[in-house]
UniProtKB/Swiss-Prot annotation, chains A, B:
<comment type="function">
    <text>May play a role in DNA repair. It seems to be involved in an RecBC-independent recombinational process of DNA repair. It may act with RecF and RecO.</text>
</comment>
<dbReference type="InterPro" id="IPR023627">
    <property type="entry name" value="Rcmb_RecR"/>
</dbReference>
<dbReference type="Pfam" id="PF21175">
    <property type="entry name" value="RecR_C"/>
</dbReference>
<dbReference type="InterPro" id="IPR006171">
    <property type="entry name" value="TOPRIM_dom"/>
</dbReference>
<dbReference type="GO" id="GO:0006281">
    <property type="term" value="P:DNA repair"/>
</dbReference>
<comment type="similarity">
    <text>Belongs to the RecR family.</text>
</comment>
<dbReference type="GO" id="GO:0006310">
    <property type="term" value="P:DNA recombination"/>
</dbReference>
<feature type="domain" description="Toprim">
    <location>
        <begin position="83"/>
        <end position="181"/>
    </location>
</feature>
<keyword id="KW-0234">DNA repair</keyword>
<keyword id="KW-0863">Zinc-finger</keyword>
<dbReference type="Pfam" id="PF21176">
    <property type="entry name" value="RecR_HhH"/>
</dbReference>
<dbReference type="GO" id="GO:0003677">
    <property type="term" value="F:DNA binding"/>
</dbReference>
<dbReference type="GO" id="GO:0008270">
    <property type="term" value="F:zinc ion binding"/>
</dbReference>
<keyword id="KW-0862">Zinc</keyword>
<keyword id="KW-0233">DNA recombination</keyword>
<dbReference type="InterPro" id="IPR034137">
    <property type="entry name" value="TOPRIM_RecR"/>
</dbReference>
<keyword id="KW-0227">DNA damage</keyword>
Length: 204, 204
């Protein structure tokens, strides 16, 4: 059974295409929009188009940034350690590290990981741009590359690939520690993580 | 900590204003929009504005309908019993009844219920429009009003108010049955519902 309005149906269909939004949620969102002032709908509509029109990738780190702020605020930031680059898979990972307010180096966003099964090879993600940043003529002051990809098979594969490419350049390659999360109980940690935590033990 | 793009922040803020969408979900939706082709964002943006611009209330039943389909498809539908009007609180309730494909009469959408605590009186919902439909000169063929408001205090109050207004017009006023839902187990039904079910028992 369909709504009595084609415009509402179209809105429900459009909402239902978003990830994690089913028909029922889409219907509730559509009814909410109908009840709100037009200004609210306009705000969301223009934010959608602005995000597509104004957001570009930073020419240095490939993270998302505004068209009029390229290079991005992190790449041009004062007090950033220009000699360390943390390599991540996607922009949300940059946000996660920035929230810690602990890491002070730069980033490089690959926008994906090597995944042969999905047809994604080294040339499909921003590896070339990373190597470009490591060339001596580009300032050449990079001392360390921190690999911070997700602990999946594809992430590990990409880390291995990158380390083999970068090590010959005489730059230190590290990866973030795998171990038990803060606040977790040993009893409920999976075997793989426990093994990694044991392997990676440090002096007290 | 904020994203490196003001446009993305604006989109996250706009998404987060939707009901049931928190910051994390809004962030995921925004990243999804960034990865989709521009056409998808355009489709949602224009659906939002169309819903505000093209959707009006049916001049008869007050349900939502397209500007170019007023009176709505139900009010003008063939094979609809013009002598029964089901009074509901909101457009989603019409949809719920239409999904049953069982009820064949007309509807009247109040767009709210009387709720003195929220400052909503009888004049703030579409009661006047309902009474207008019951006037003899308006065709005057309405035989029965079915009250199908939600079983809340406000819904019951509104039902009582309507029944007192309409009964003097010589029109039958009924309300939908309260009882145990199909498929429920008696053991887990609350006392109020069980009492209503017992009161409303019918011959087998």
């Amino acid at each position: 059974m369909r709504y009595t309005s084609a415009a509402i149906e179209a809105l429900i269909d459009a909402f239902a295409k978003l990830p994690g939004v089913g028909r029922k949620t889409a219907r509730r969102l559509a009814m909410h929009v109908l009840q709100q002032p037009r200004l609210e709908a306009e705000r969301l509509a223009s934010a959608l188009l602005d995000a597509k029109d104004l957001v570009v990738r930073c020419s240095i780190c490939q993270n998302v940034t505004d068209r009029d702020a390229d290079p991005c605020r992190i790449c041009t930031g004062q007090g950033r350690d220009q000699s360390v680059i943390c390599v991540v898979e996607s922009p949300v990972d940059v946000l996660a590290f920035e929230k810690t307010a602990h890491y002070k180096g730069l980033y490089h966003v690959l926008h994906g990981v090597i995944s042969p099964l999905d047809g994604i090879g080294p040339d499909d993600i921003n590896i070339r741009e990373l190597l470009q940043r490591l060339q001596p003529e580009e300032g050449g002051e990079v001392r360390e590359i921190v690999l911070a990809l997700n602990p999946t098979v594809e992430g590990e594969t990409t880390s291995l690939y990158l380390s083999r490419l970068i090590a010959p350049l005489g730059i230190m390659v590290t990866k973030i520690a795998r171990g038990i999360p803060v606040g977790a109980e040993l009893e409920f940690i999976d075997e793989a993580t426990l093994s990694r935590a044991m392997e990676g033990r440090t002096t007290f």
